[in-house]
């Protein structure tokens, strides 16, 4: 029987290799502001989600070091035992005050936060409605939950309206900014549509810190307040982890019944301390968003006439190429020129929509953007 495991694993790996869809870890020596180093060669890094340039910021590094000196290296237990400290409580309070919620529940990753929410909240009689392009963590959780899951066409509020049933206990889930396409959900229209008919949950992993007043995210920018808001700390915060923002009752429910929370070791308190500092930097250092906006405008101006360009209002700039081979080839050619841009292929994106996923951060310069555009133009002209 054990040979079946081996055979099945080998078959799956061979099929992925044959389809040229194998993904491999990229061993990096270190990263710096807007750059990364691999085997002693420096590349411009246009594949990072560090939108505000905080991941290598000296002020944030110092905050983590201060947290280590004060709280030690790890939490030592789950939050429900002895793993919850004053550093965690301060982070929760900061998030609630900033984003306007009664409770914030911390998780080790956005993936675990999304899975915990859908596994815990949904029951067999419930209806889960998800945008077709939602993140894999949401889709997988929806498929494994006891609820009936239906997907509405991407950003299509009319299709969502057709799927909503007033008699059902419904949860509508969308991302604020979609991670592979860089477009924004029509949150105001969705919120109006679901009002008093369903709960709304927004995963704002790629909007928090970047959009809205004081970086409060997609929902604040759209003027809405969903019942559940998920924010993650691996993008604009420059760190790792996630939080679920909700009312007091939902927060208590998650604390009691969300297994990802109850049975996982709490994030290190030094990390929570650094995250609180990152949240305050995001709110107070508006120059980072202003600088990012200037760089996004520069990118659009330099690239709009190059084949494959897709306009977005966010730091995520998909460059659609279609085939996986085309995306891999373009990524390789850019790397040869010292520019690191990842090729995104199925199953991460639908078949026929392979792309370069270019991300702009506040740590870049306009000179670096111009260099990227010149090389993109060269690669696209060569391929056509």
UniProtKB/Swiss-Prot annotation:
Superkingdom, natural source: Bacteria
Species the sequence originates in: Vibrio cholerae serotype O1 (strain ATCC 39315 / El Tor Inaba N16961)
Function: Catalyzes the decarboxylative condensation of pimeloyl-[acyl-carrier protein] and L-alanine to produce 8-amino-7-oxononanoate (AON), [acyl-carrier protein], and carbon dioxide.
UniProt keyword annotations, A-Z: Biotin biosynthesis, Pyridoxal phosphate, Transferase
Cofactor: pyridoxal 5'-phosphate
Quaternary structure (record): Homodimer.
GO biological process: biotin biosynthetic process
Family membership: Belongs to the class-II pyridoxal-phosphate-dependent aminotransferase family. BioF subfamily.
Designated gene of the protein: bioF
Gene3D superfamilies: Aspartate Aminotransferase, domain 1, Type I PLP-dependent aspartate aminotransferase-like (Major domain)
Keyword hit for Transferase: yes
Catalytic reactions of this protein: 6-carboxyhexanoyl-[ACP] + L-alanine + H(+) = (8S)-8-amino-7-oxononanoate + holo-[ACP] + CO2
EC number in record: 2.3.1.47
Residue numbers of N6-(pyridoxal phosphate)lysine PTMs: 235
Protein name: 8-amino-7-oxononanoate synthase
List of residues binding pyridoxal 5'-phosphate: 110-111, 179, 206, 232
